[in-house]
Amino acid sequence: MNPISLLFLALAMSTDAFAAALGKGASLHKPRFIEALRTGLIFGAIETITPVIGWGIGQVAARFAESWDHWIAFTLLLVLGLHMIYNGIKHDDDEEQEKPGQHSFWILAVTAFATSIDALAVGVGLAFVDVNIVIAALAIGLATTVMVTIGVMLGRVLGTMVGKRAEIVGGIVLIIVGATILYEHLSAA
């Protein structure tokens, strides 16, 4: 795989994570760069690992991954999105929210995994292409880290505009990302 193709692959793999990061940034109370970077690193690490796992699985699991990846991603993002909407409604007057400016590691990791399931499937395909999987995975992870960090900071602007309802907006964004993943896979079938 040539470097230009690898760059486009890395950017394409980071788009779902970028969209989810916009939602995460919108739901945070004035996120600092360090929080955006932390989120980017979590997403980037998971997005680096998933194509390697997919590459290792190979052709046998390709049919399973292709037939279920969109449903798994949609379900995870739907549940996370609904949870964020619920918290946004429930916590309007309740101060028992997570610390302002921070999401838990597990919420970020599950969201990152949900948006990286397509990278798992891509990894399966990369097993049959002349590509150095380590370089490809690192490129995908780096692109995701950068895109997610930017997405969280851009989401901050969105969060400032919508005020208290930012977590609801973030949840809606996650649901839209999940629905888009599902739609793209079903319409291609």
From Swiss-Prot:
Keyword set, alphabetical order: Cell inner membrane, Cell membrane, Ion transport, Manganese, Membrane, Transmembrane, Transmembrane helix, Transport
Superkingdom of this protein's organism: Bacteria
Signal peptide: none
GO molecular function: manganese ion transmembrane transporter activity
Membrane-spanning residues: 3-23, 41-61, 69-89, 105-125, 133-153, 168-188
Keyword Acetylation: no
Subcellular location: Cell inner membrane
One cellular component term from this protein's GO annotations in UniProt: plasma membrane
Record's bilayer topology term: Multi-pass membrane protein
Biological function: Probably functions as a manganese efflux pump.
Alphabetical list of HAMAP family matching this protein: MntP_pump (MF_01521)
Assigned protein family: Belongs to the MntP (TC 9.B.29) family.
Record protein name field: Putative manganese efflux pump MntP
Organism: Pseudomonas savastanoi pv. phaseolicola (strain 1448A / Race 6) (Pseudomonas syringae pv. phaseolicola (strain 1448A / Race 6))
Gene: mntP
